[in-house]
Amino acid sequence: MLPVVALVGRPNVGKSTLFNRLTRTRDALVADFPGLTRDRKYGQANYDGYQFIVIDTGGIHGDEEGIDEEMAKQSLLAVDEADVVLFMVDARDGVTVGDQAIADHLRKQNKKVYLVCNKIDGIDAHSAMADFYSLSLGELYGIAAAHGRGVEQLLEICFKPIAEEYPDVIVPKDVASEELEHDEIDYDKLPLKLAIVGRPNVGKSTLINRILGEERVVVYDMPGTTRDSVYIPMQRNEREYVLIDTAGVRRRGRIGEAIEKFSVVKTLQAIEDANVVLIVVDARETISDQDLNLIGFALNAGRSIVIAVNKWDGLQNDHKEEIKRELDRRLGFVDFARLHFISALHGTGVGHLFESVEEAYASATQRISTSKLTKIMEMAQEEHQPPLVSGRRVKLKYAHAGGYNPPRIIIHGNQVKDLPGAYQRYLINYFRKSLGVMGTPIKVEFREPVNPYEGKKNQLTLSQQRKRRRLMKFLKKKK
C-alpha cells in the first residue's frame, strides 16, 4: 500500500505549487477526476526512492463561525484517507479566520498534522512564522514551494513516522530492484494479485461475484491494508490468486448494481499492490477520460493490464461496430493489452479473462538472457539504423535485463541518451514483437560509458611544471 499525504489549506497558499513540485517525476499522475472528487487532485510522487500518493484538496474557506459542516465533509474527505496531513498557510498573510477554522477541524482528527508556512522567501521568516504558533498544532516548518526551499527537509521529517508504521511496505526502489535482480524468485509459486478497477457502476461488483460464483470454492474476505479494499484469496486451475476488490464488501448473492462510492486513493493503491490490473469499462458509455487516466496510471506504475468491456450483451451489431472503432481510436497507446467483450451479469466471456491475465503475468515475469536481448537489438539495428546525432551515428553495443514485472531492458552504447523518441519507441515495439510480450509495458533504459576523467584537471608532471615556469619567465622578459 502506498502511503497518502494530503495538502490542506486556504486557496492560494501554495498547495498546487507544492503538489506540482512533489509530482514532478515521470511517474506522476497529473489528472483530475471531475465529478467524482470535486476539486481534489491526486498524484503519485517520489521522495528518495519512496513512493507515495499526494492529494491537493483544493481551497477550503472559513468564517468566524468555523467551517460549514457539510462543506467540511466534502472538502476534507482527503484527511480521512491520509496518513499525513500537511496544513499549509501563507506566511505573508499571517493567521486568518480561515486558518483558524481549518486548524480547529484538524485538531479533532486523529491524524499526524504538520503546519507548513509557505512563501518564506524574501521576508523575515522567524517573525512571520511566530504568529502561527497560536494555531496550537505544534512545530512549524517553513518552506518556499515555488523555489523548493525547505521541501526536502519537510519530507524527511514527514516520512519518519510513515516508515516506522509501514517498514515492510515502503522500500526504496533501488533496493527492491537489486533484490529482484539477485534473488531467484519463482513467480509461478506466488499468488497472482489481480486488481479489478473501474469507474462506479461499470459492473465491478457483478464481475467479482460472477468470478467467485463460477469457481465454486470456499472464499473468505481478508481485509487488506489498503483502505476499504478487500483481498479475496481464490484458486483457479490449481493457480493461487488474490482478487483485490476496490468496490467494497458485499454478500455474494447481492449482485445488483448499487451506486458505488468511488475512492481514487483506494483504486490507485490497489493498482500499485497488484501484479495485473483488470480495467472494467462500460460498453454503453464507451471509453471515458477517467478510464484513460486509470490505464495511464497502471502503465506508469509498470503493471500488466487487461481491459474488459462490460455490458456487451443486448447491443445491436451496428452499435457494437461503432464501439469497436471508438476503442481502436482511443486505446491505440495500449495496443499490446488484450481486449475482452463480456457480460458479467450473464457470464459471457468471463472465463476467457483469466487466459489473458495469466498471459500478461507470464510476459511480465519471463527471464530473458543477455545474449537473446543483444541479438534482438542487433536485428533491430540491421533493419533500421539509429539516426545521426551531431553528425555521428549512435552506436548500440549490447542489451541486458534490468528487472522484471515489468520487464526492464538496459541498452548500453555511445550517445544513446540522444536517441530521438521515435527510435526509442521503435526499439520497444521491436523487443515486444520479438519476445512475444502481451499485456505488460516494457521499460527501456539507455546508458553510456562513464568517462573517469570527466570534470578532472590534468596534473602536470615535474618536467611539465619546470617547462611552464621557463615559458612564463621568457614571456615576462619579452614584455
Curated annotation (Swiss-Prot):
- Which residue ranges does the record assign to the KH-like domain? 366-450
Q: Give the record's GO biological process terms.
A: ribosome biogenesis
Instruction: Tell me its family.
Output: Belongs to the TRAFAC class TrmE-Era-EngA-EngB-Septin-like GTPase superfamily. EngA (Der) GTPase family.
Q: Which residues form a coiled coil?
A: none
**Its function?**
GTPase that plays an essential role in the late steps of ribosome biogenesis.
**Name of the encoding gene:** der
Source superkingdom? Bacteria
Q: Which NCBIfam families match?
A: GTPase_EngA, small_GTP
Residues recorded as binding GTP 1, renumbered to this chain, are: 9-16, 56-60, 118-121
Which UniProt keywords are given for this protein, alphabetically ordered?
A: GTP-binding, Nucleotide-binding, Repeat, Ribosome biogenesis
Boundaries of every EngA-type G domain copy: 3-166, 192-365
Report the SMART domains cross-referenced here: AAA
Record's subunit section: Associates with the 50S ribosomal subunit.
Instruction: Give GO terms: molecular function aspect only.
Output: ATP hydrolysis activity; GTP binding; ribosome binding
| UniProt xrefs under InterPro entries | AAA+_ATPase, G_ENGA, GTP-bd, GTPase_Der, KH_dom-like, KH_dom-like_a/b, P-loop_NTPase, Small_GTP-bd
- Pfam families to which the protein is assigned, alphabetical: KH_dom-like, MMR_HSR1
Question: Is Repeat among the key words of this record?
Answer: yes
In Swiss-Prot or TrEMBL terms, this protein is called GTPase Der
SUPFAM superfamilies, A to Z: P-loop containing nucleoside triphosphate hydrolases (SSF52540)
List ligand-binding residues for GTP 2: 198-205, 245-249, 310-313
